[in-house]
Structure formats: structure tokens, C-alpha cells
């Protein structure tokens, strides 16, 4: 982790995600050279997986990207304003602050206000998260938002 706050989703550069993922893939390919490497990735993992597959196209036998995060959601804040604020916060050393309106994990939340479609799955994961601090990542930092914006621009400019 790049921050001491276990609730904060923070990264210094989106390229770290790609490098870490490709390092894991390299290890798997070395350990199991006769097996095909298939990639299934969702949301931000879909963006990371898509870039990784573009950087190392010969590594993956099949690639499935489920709702890849081409651009992060910024709630009711327009994209140009959200990225401008994130850049300013990063320039002034506030990259590890929570994005406005976000807070640390506190265990609150309900199925009814979530985007989940399966109540048993929601409850199971909520209980796991409550029991395991390492699963309590919760809210993005301005650094994460800025890195995600840079990744978004990279994806759209390097089709």
C-alpha cells in the first residue's frame, strides 16, 4: 500500500497497476508455460487488463473485459471540474486526501442504497469486509482520481 489509511484507495500512477499486473502474469507464465493465459477483468481491472493485453498481446489466449472503466464516475461533478480539482490537489501535495464527499470505511451502507443486484452476495461481502481490514478499501483519493483520469486519456488516445 502506498498510504497508511486502509480505507483510502490511492495510487501514484496508473502505470503501477499495469506493471504489477504484468509482473504477476509473467510469474504465472513462467510457472505454467504449457497453459494458456486467459484474462477476465471487470471495471478498473478491465481498463488495466485492456492496457496490459495491448502492451503484451502475445501473452493472452483470450481476453474478456466486463464494463471496463474507460472513465471513472464523478457523481454530479462534471468531468473537467473533477479532474481539475484532482490535479490542483495533487500539485499542492493533497493527493492522499479523500475526494470531496467521500469518507473512510465505517461499515454503514445497505443493500437498498447499493448498486448490488443480489442481496445474499451483498450481505456475504459486507460481512467479509467487516471482518477483514484488508478488504475495507472504500473511498478514492485525489491521487487515485488523477491517476484514473490519466489512464482514461491514455485509453482513449491509444485505441
Residue spans of the language-model regions?
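Conserved alpha/beta-hydrolase
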Residues: 1-4
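Alpha/beta-hydrolase active-site loop
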Residues: 9-29
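Conserved serine/cysteine hydrolase catalytic core
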Residues: 137-159
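Alpha/beta-hydrolase fold nucleophile elbow
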Residues: 32-43
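Short acidic-aromatic active-site loops that bind/stabilize oxyanions
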Residues: 11-14, 134-142
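Hydrophobic helix-cap positions at the C-terminus of alpha-helices
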Residues: 28, 52, 155-158
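Short, well-ordered alpha-helices that flank and scaffold nucleotide-derived cofactor binding pockets
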Residues: 30, 54-58, 150
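Alpha/beta-hydrolase-fold enzymes
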Residues: 44, 48-137
Amino acid at each position: 500500500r502506498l498510504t497508511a489509511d486502509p480505507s483510502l484507495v490511492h495510487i501514484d500512477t496508473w502505470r503501477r497497476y499495469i506493471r504489477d499486473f504484468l509482473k504477476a502474469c509473467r510469474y504465472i507464465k513462467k510457472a505454467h508455460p504449457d497453459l494458456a493465459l486467459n484474462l477476465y477483468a471487470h471495471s478498473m481491472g478491465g481498463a488495466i487488463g485492456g492496457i496490459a493485453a495491448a502492451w503484451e498481446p502475445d501473452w493472452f489466449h483470450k481476453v474478456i473485459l466486463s464494463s471496463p472503466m474507460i472513465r471513472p464516475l464523478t457523481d454530479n461533478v462534471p468531468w473537467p471540474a473533477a479532474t481539475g480539482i484532482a490535479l490542483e490537489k495533487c500539485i499542492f501535495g493533497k493527493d492522499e486526501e479523500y475526494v470531496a464527499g467521500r469518507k473512510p470505511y465505517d461499515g454503514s451502507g445497505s443493500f437498498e442504497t447499493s448498486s448490488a443486484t443480489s442481496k445474499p452476495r451483498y450481505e456475504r461481502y459486507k460481512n467479509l469486509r467487516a471482518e477483514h481490514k484488508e478488504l475495507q478499501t472504500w473511498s478514492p483519493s485525489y491521487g487515485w482520481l488523477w491517476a484514473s483520469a490519466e489512464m482514461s486519456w491514455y485509453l482513449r488516445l491509444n485505441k
